[in-house]
Amino acid sequence: MSYNLPNPSLIGILLIISTHSGPQLIYKQPPGLTKEPDEDEGEYDQEDIAETESDEYGNYFEYDEDSNMYGTNLYKQWDANHLNYYMGTKKDLISFLDEIETKRKQASMKAVAKKRSQLSKIASNPSTISTTGNSGNDSIFGIEPAYLCEMLAPPKKMCNSRFEIMIDDKIFLGLPVHKYDNGSWRLKGSSKRINRNKEENTHQHEVDNSKSKLNLNMFHLVFIMNPPVIEYNYRIDEMFHYVISRLSLVLRYEQSKNDFISNQVKMILNLKEQFKEKEELESQLLNKSSLCKMIHDCYLSISQSKIANLSVNNKLRSFQIPIKTEFHSLPESSVPFIPGSHLSSTVGLLGTTGLINVGETTRYGEAMNDENEGISEAADDIVYFALLLLDDAESIIRDIKTESSGTLAKFIRMINPTESLLKLSTRSNSLDTLQVKSFAFHLIYWRRARVIQPLSTRSVYFVSPMAPITTNLYTDIREFKKSFPTLPSLPQFLKLLSPQSKKPSQFATVIPSKDHRDIYFEALSWLIRFGYVTQLQTFIWLKISRKIKIKVEEDLENESSSRKRSNITKKLLMGGTDNSSKDPAAESSTDNRIMDQNDDKEENATKQLSNINAEDQEIENIKERLKSTSLGPLVSLEDDDDTILLDPGRATTLERRWINKIIFDECKLSSELTNAFYKLLKYMDGKSPLELLLLKENISRTEIRKLLIAIEDHIISVRHW
């Protein structure tokens, strides 16, 4: 398993409330939470335990309890028809067997302890024999609901914050919402306002309670999870962040405004009084209670890693745990990922905006967290990109249940992977840039579109290193032939993009004629959608050679020495002069003495200047002698190696002098190329592709080509995805 693979580990949802009469369980989903999710009908006994201790690894798959290490059924995980079969590695198998051994021993000890505890309970209380059947049907994983409610209804001080408790290797995670002392479910913006309206709110709350006859103090939507041990923190954190916290706050808002939870709880309790049979009761709850229907839909969607479109008090809300199908760099060989994932450095630029959930490139590593200050700028950059629909336009319109003649439907039909969103907004009279960005964000969130650079015949495309050739190729060959019967087959098309004998070339060389342009772009869109092809992009760094650094160093030394020489001369010539007014009688009486002093100062200044010139001459002689020796080049304030500027857009004073030396002295760029150079400067960080520069800046390909030829000795260029 890996962080890149969806694994919600959700096995159930509980709704707990607390009133004056105490906590109670209102609803649970799924209804049958009395067994382990993958528990077999048979149980461990002493003979089975003895057999497993002497057996080899071949019988480990007989015990589904071992699958808790990975949170899935082992039959499914290692089945050739299952997705995870194609993602396994040698390291996966070794760690799998080691963890199975540990879990097997734990299961053996647990089975023995469980039988002993059951025997002791029966021996101490014989009456439990007759009641075991009834209580077992209502228990939740062997725990009595009343006892579980006491643990899942925390005190008031522990509410309105994250709640997490582990019971029998299962995580009960939630955000308990408790009402405040003033009767409100939400904190007001000002404490003075709370104090001023406290009596009024309390009175109104008492009136509401008398009408509703349900004094609801707390409600808690609890998610039951069994994540893998090695993914424990990651899985519960993403569940709480993306689903639990947001859904609980939405429910708190509806309870505060409309008493939504209170009214639904009353309805559920009434239905429980009317219908005693479980199947009929469950059917009535789903048909009549919108809260039960919401919990049911949430469990089904989130447990299957789908988007949960929930109706909360007749308002549509969407929740999901994002799936990682976007990668900015190639994952390690031992890191599994979803087949068909997209590989592009553009993901790294937009990953900080929240639009894209970037995949992990290392095994169980931390998520990429580039703390860029330009997050809002990166979000604005989306208008320069294009959208690639991940399904047919009409199918998307039907799935998201929007009006066929609505603005969103028109926008979806307008989307073309060859045009940027900015061009779409200028081409449409009814859509501005903000609306286009908003619609794009929604389609990306709903997993209906992907951000790409606009397709162009001048761009270069090649077979992605993450192409699902080993998993989906044979199926996709038929699908590609069905969608594009007049084009070459899928393997042949991929061979055209990435030939063995030469480098990949522009996409225009693949298209036979102008008449084939549209169909070839459609085929290219299909290949990018399913992860077979990605764009080849150009990245550059600005290189500062040792020669440039020595010249700048010499300029700095010359400036420093000339500055010191001028300062000394000023001090010697002007330091003893006194321009203050004096008594004429005193001046006439001391003229001879002042003239003698001035003569002495001029002589001293002449001597000091001659000494300075002698010292400068001696320094020059030392430099000449050092140059003539073999150790001369090593005597420098700078390193011998060249320097690569990682962020020339934020260059220091010294780095700016290096850059100016390249522009004006070494390359002697014209004014037009100098302006183009300064536009290109912030893209010389090895992270921003030049193709993005062409999209954002008002600069032509010809001008870029001339500039790169002029400064080719001072740049390092790399081409990759």
Swiss-Prot record:
> What InterPro entries does the record point to?
HTH_NPRL3, Npr3
* Tagged with keyword Hydrolase: no
Q: Name one GO cellular component term.
A: GATOR1 complex
Write down what this protein is called: Nitrogen permease regulator 3
What's a BP term from Gene Ontology annotated to this protein?
Answer: positive regulation of autophagy
Q: Which UniProt keywords apply?
A: Meiosis, Signal
Query: Acidic residues bias located where?
Result: 37-54
Can you tell which superkingdom this protein's organism belongs to?
Answer: Eukaryota
- Physiological role: Mediates inactivation of the TORC1 complex in response to amino acid starvation. Required for meiotic nuclear division.
Task: Give the similarity note.
Answer: Belongs to the NPR3 family.
Per UniProt, what is the name of the gene that codes for the protein in this document?
Answer: NPR3
The segments labelled Disordered in the record are 27-54, 555-614
The signal peptide annotation in the UniProt record is: 1-21
